[in-house]
């Protein structure tokens, strides 16, 4: 009887008591039958990626597809020949780990990407992908496949499944993975009482597994407070999608149209990510991101409770000695790379890589980004690979603390070896904070924006009113069926996606920002909304001179201003750089039957999760400030597809907080500062939803 009551209480909780934000209307777009057919073919190659379904169409096509016999169906025969040469010498074996940060594995993945990218038409692309799905390593295939779908014109708008649905083992800890394997091996629940105690319930036709965030076992330090943020599946998917949009080995001139601002985009992405992380540190009482030295022990350890199907992740203890004998040469390189940049700053000019760059010019921003990413646009194609060595990759290897690879195809991964897991490691933020610090040193040489440049003649922001800002935790389910292996019979009968992971994730109530503008003229304007701290970690008010780099750009849009009073009501659901949670593939198929796809997943899949817009608040309200900046709109004349939402004009990304600030110039009628507080309702810590007590929590956040 007790078992029944406990189970009933748990199911009742997860079905009715958990609070969700007000339901939103799913924004979709109509697609034609050709698109639907292509979309289904693309999705089929993502399913059960660690297994081969010999009954599926892709297997029958890929098993016997002859690339060499079809070489005329590719626009770059040299790329196909290079792939075949490498393939005949041997590619990464199936079921080995793949990481783009290992040179040999990356070279093979790039060759595979070229095979996909240079296919003349979708049919050839699909056959090439089916060949790779059958014959090549699954991790290597997925990496090249994701990028090719984004870069090819005939797959533009195709919906990509969330990476946590494809690689669940990289997004949840091993204890959850073990529960799923155990249930599968037992063909269901054997002991209901034990199942409930360990956070496993059966709801309708699927099993639900409660998944904890990491605790003091993983973070034997204060970083465990941030696990709900750094391990959020949406945030980690966001970082993965950033990379596949702009891989560091990718040449902008060859594949895209972003060469002039590529390095700037790199800086802006990491600057904004670190600022958002800093906000979370503030509200958790941690303050600034710690610094480290290549010549002293790294204070922050990390014991990731992650594993692939084949290899556990390496661990780094607290006070890890990076300056060890095996790292001497790598640290000499890292130190020299940093010093070379600092010396160039002192001279005001950078000479190298066949370029002369004057560092007191704002146009150098993109070069500086290319330098620190060490991407393909830093070097000309005539420069041999022998002269290229990536600062980022070497730094990840040193901080990851993994043993030396056994051979070219065998290595023990660290969290820093994958874009899907990097954000879990606290040293990730410390490393990129170090890189952004060098950017900020460069920006000290730039002239601050003048009062004349910031001023908007005839336009004044009279007032800004912000609704109450409220955060809370809510349960979120995602499909994790790809974790387990299916029998041939289950594959043949399209075994239902019936394994789900449930986690408490941060969210917020939608809010409005009301902006009152008085204008003497009719004009087109850009309206930007920033969020920044009100006080630093020591409780002192921040200053624009010292803290200009700590403002997070939440939204920007254009608006036609008319003479007289103008009232703009901007809802948080309209903020441009945020997206809704991805739909599971099962829901995508249902929409495809109606000739529709989710707009967010088709157009904006690389955006930040909307639920992480605000940092977790406090019971009494944590102080922040919003800044509204209105300035004249001047459209860009360049084609920047698909980045036009980020670059609506020719102003620097993050403008006007893109460089050091002269406070007197910010006292403008078109710039308005508004103090706000972020409140948190319901359970304050994610672990308060923990097993086994998570069925008795008291979250009473009302729906609006």
Curated annotation (Swiss-Prot):
Keywords: Disulfide bond, Glycoprotein, Secreted, Signal, Storage protein
Subunit structure: Homohexamer of two stacked trimers; disulfide-linked.
Glycosylation sites: 73, 212, 360
Cellular-component GO terms for this entry: extracellular region
Job of this protein: Arylphorin is a larval storage protein (LSP) which may serve as a storage protein used primarily as a source of aromatic amino acids for protein synthesis during metamorphosis. It is a constituent of the sclerotizing system of the cuticle, and serves as a carrier for ecdysteroid hormone.
Entries under InterPro entries matching the protein: Di-copper_centre_dom_sf, Hemocyanin/hexamerin, Hemocyanin/hexamerin_mid_dom, Hemocyanin_C, Hemocyanin_C_sf, Hemocyanin_N, Hemocyanin_N_sf, Ig_E-set
Name of protein: Arylphorin
Secretion signal, residue range per the UniProt entry: 1-16
Major location (coarse): secreted
Parts of the chain that traverse the membrane: none
Subcellular location: Secreted, Extracellular space
Gene3D superfamilies found in the cross-reference section: Di-copper center containing domain from catechol oxidase, Hemocyanin, C-terminal domain, Hemocyanin, N-terminal domain
Single GO molecular function: nutrient reservoir activity
Sequence similarity: Belongs to the hemocyanin family.
The record's account of how the chain is modified after translation: Glycosylation at Asn-360 is required for proper folding.
Pfam families: Hemocyanin_C, Hemocyanin_M, Hemocyanin_N
């Amino acid at each position: 009887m007790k078992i029944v009551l406990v189970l009933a209480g748990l199911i009742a909780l997860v079905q009715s008591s958990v609070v969700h934000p007000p339901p939103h209307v799913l924004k979709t777009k109509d697609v034609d039958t050709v698109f639907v057919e292509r979309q289904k073919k693309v999705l089929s190659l993502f399913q059960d990626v660690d297994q081969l379904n010999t009954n599926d169409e892709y297997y029958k096509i890929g098993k016997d597809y002859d690339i060499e016999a079809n070489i005329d169906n590719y626009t770059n025969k040299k790329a196909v020949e290079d792939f075949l040469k490498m393939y005949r010498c041997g590619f990464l074996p199936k079921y080995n780990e793949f990481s783009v940060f290992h040179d040999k594995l990356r070279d093979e993945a790039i060759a595979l990407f070229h095979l996909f990218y240079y296919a003349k038409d979708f049919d050839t692309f699909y056959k090439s992908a089916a060949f790779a799905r059958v014959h090549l390593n699954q991790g290597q295939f997925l990496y090249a496949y994701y990028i090719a779908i984004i870069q090819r014109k005939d797959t533009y708008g195709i919906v990509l499944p969330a990476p946590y649905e494809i690689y669940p083992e990289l997004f949840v800890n091993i204890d959850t993975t073990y529960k799923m394997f155990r249930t599968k091996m037992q063909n269901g629940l054997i002991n209901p009482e034990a199942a409930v105690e360990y956070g496993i319930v059966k709801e309708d036709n699927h099993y639900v597994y409660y998944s904890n965030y990491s605790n003091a076992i993983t973070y034997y330090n204060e970083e465990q407070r941030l696990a709900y943020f750094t391990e959020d599946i949406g945030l980690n998917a966001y970082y993965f999608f950033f990379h596949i949009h702009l891989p560091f080995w990718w040449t902008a001139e060859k594949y895209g149209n972003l060469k002039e601002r590529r390095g700037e985009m790199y800086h802006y992405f990491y600057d904004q990510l670190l600022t958002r992380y800093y906000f979370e540190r503030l509200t958790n009482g941690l303050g600034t991101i710690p610094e480290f030295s290549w010549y002293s022990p790294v204070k922050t350890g990390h014991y990731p409770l992650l594993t692939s199907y084949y290899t556990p992740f390496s661990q780094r203890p607290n006070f890890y000695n990076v300056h060890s004998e095996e790292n001497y040469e790598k640290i000499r390189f890292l130190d020299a790379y940093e010093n070379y940049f600092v010396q160039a700053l002192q001279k005001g000019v950078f000479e190298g890589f066949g370029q002369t760059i004057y560092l007191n010019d704002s146009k150098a921003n993109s070069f500086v980004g290319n330098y620190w990413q060490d991407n393909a646009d830093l070097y000309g194609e005539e420069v041999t690979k022998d002269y290229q060595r990536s600062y980022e990759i070497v730094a990840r290897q040193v901080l990851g603390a993994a043993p030396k690879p056994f051979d070219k195809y065998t290595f023990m991964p660290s969290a820093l070896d994958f874009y899907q897991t990097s954000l879990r490691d606290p040293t990730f933020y410390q490393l990129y904070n170090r890189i952004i610090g060098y950017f900020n040193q460069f920006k000290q040489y730039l002239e601050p924006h003048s009062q004349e440049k910031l001023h908007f003649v005839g336009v004044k922001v009279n007032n800004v009113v912000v609704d109450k800002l409220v955060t809370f935790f809510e349960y979120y389910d995602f499909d994790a069926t790809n974790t387990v292996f299916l029998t041939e019979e289950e594959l043949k009968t399209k075994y239902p996606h019936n394994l789900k992971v449930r986690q408490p994730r941060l969210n917020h109530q939608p809010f409005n920002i009301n902006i009152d503008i008085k204008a003497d003229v009719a004009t087109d304007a850009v309206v930007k909304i920033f969020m920044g701290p009100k006080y630093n970690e020591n409780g002192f008010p921040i200053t624009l001179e010292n803290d200009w780099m700590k403002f997070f750009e939440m939204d920007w849009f254009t608006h036609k201003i008319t003479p007289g009073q103008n009232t703009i009501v901007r809802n948080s659901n309209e903020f441009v750089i945020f997206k809704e949670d991805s739909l599971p593939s099962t829901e995508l198929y249902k929409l495809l039957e109606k000739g529709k796809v989710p707009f967010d997943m088709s157009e904006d899949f690389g955006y930040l999760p909307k639920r992480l817009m605000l940092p977790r608040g406090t019971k009494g309200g944590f102080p922040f400030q919003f800044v509204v900046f209105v300035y004249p709109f001047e459209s860009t004349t360049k084609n920047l597809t698909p980045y036009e939402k980020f670059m609506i004009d020719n102003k620097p990304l993050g403008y006007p907080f893109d460089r050091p600030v002269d406070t007197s110039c910010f006292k403008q009628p078109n710039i308005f500062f508004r103090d706000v507080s972020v409140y948190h309702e319901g359970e304050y810590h994610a672990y308060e939803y923990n097993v086994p007590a998570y069925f008795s929590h008291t979250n009473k956040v009302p729906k609006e």
